[in-house]
From Swiss-Prot:
Transmembrane segments: none
Lineage of the organism: Bacteria, Pseudomonadati, Pseudomonadota, Gammaproteobacteria, Enterobacterales
EC main group: hydrolase
Name of this chain's protein: Non-specific ribonucleoside hydrolase RihC
MF term (GO), any: uridine nucleosidase activity
Length: 304
């Protein structure tokens, strides 16, 4: 059986790898993509997502989502992904367009049509998911689970404690984490371990057309380097769906700080149960790195 998934994304260079895996992993059935402002503006993330779908000739509907966070000014990660979000490769022109409805309504409609509950995968800020849950609460029974790339049980990557996807819209993340749906959180604790080695990166141009494209993008990606290895943050969310045995998870109570002067966007992960609150998130805390690297090599070899 193929696992049906909807993917909410903000491409982004490592998003491109995650999208490739979502399309080509034989265990998955990617049925809908939605975009959100995050790494770059939503206009750019939508353009990038459509370019990738055209590159792979993938007939997957795509809806453009939120352009700004729920209540605060937008921030981006152009310093990591470049101003366009996917600099380094010249994609061919196409005439693909997004659906004519907002992302959260596209997700709602697709959930209500689905014959079984669907797994949502969110690898950008959680604005679209928060809009779905707050505006369309009738959809909750149709969500099997939500798997996210975001958060951290320890250090952050855009502030001392906050990870970018959560910090970009803390109010949205807080809404999602309070929603009661099943959540699997793949945060920096595992994604900082998810490194593609220089030796493997050097093989990509000869792998296939996807490898050549990704190698060109990686030369502009600033989450590591081609000489030291590159962190594949977003890919971890897809990897968990296919190879959950590679991850060590612990059910924890997780809250999102929205008010702190220095801690806004922090995921407060109660690993030891100090707060006495019931767990609401399965938090990934460790990764089988060699197993992850082997799986990445296998799935990208299929991405022709």
């Amino acid at each position: 059986m193929h696992l049906p998934i909807f993917l909410d994304t903000d491409p982004g260079i490592d998003d491109a790898v995650a999208i490739a895996a979502a399309i080509f992993a034989p265990e998955l059935d990617l049925q809908l993509m939605t975009t959100v402002a995050g790494n770059v503006s939503v206009e750019k993330t939508t353009r990038n997502a459509l370019q990738l779908l055209h590159f792979w000739n993938a007939e997957i509907p795509l809806a453009q989502g939120a352009a700004v966070p729920l209540v605060r000014a937008p921030r981006d990660a152009a310093s990591v992904h470049g101003e366009s979000g996917m600099a380094g490769y010249d994609f061919v022109e196409h005439n693909r367009k997004p659906l004519g409805i907002p992302a959260f309504l596209a997700i709602r409609d697709a959930l209500m049509r689905a014959p079984e509950p669907v797994t949502l995968v969110a690898i950008g800020p959680l604005t679209n998911i928060a809009l779905l849950l707050s505006q369309c609460p009738e959809c909750k029974p149709y969500i099997r689970r939500l798997v996210i790339m975001g958060g951290s049980a320890g250090r952050g990557n855009c502030t001392p404690n906050a990870e970018f996807n959560i910090a970009a819209d803390p109010e949205a993340a807080a809404c999602v984490f309070r929603s009661g749906i099943e959540i699997v959180m793949s945060g920096l604790d595992v994604t900082n371990q998810a490194i593609l080695t220089p030796d493997y990166l050097a093989t990509l141009p000869e792998l296939n057309r996807t490898g050549k494209m990704l190698h060109a993008l990686f030369s502009h990606y600033r989450s590591g380097s081609m000489q030291s290895g590159l962190r594949m943050h977003d890919l971890c969310a897809i990897a968990w769906l296919v190879r959950p045995e590679l991850f060590t998870l612990k059910p924890c109570f997780v809250a999102v700080e929205t008010q702190g002067e220095f801690t806004s966007g922090t995921t407060v992960v109660d690993i030891d149960g100090c707060l006495g609150k019931p767990a609401n998130v399965k938090v990934a805390l460790d990764l089988d790195v060699k197993g992850f690297q082997q799986w990445v090599a296998e799935v990208l070899a299929l991405a022709s």
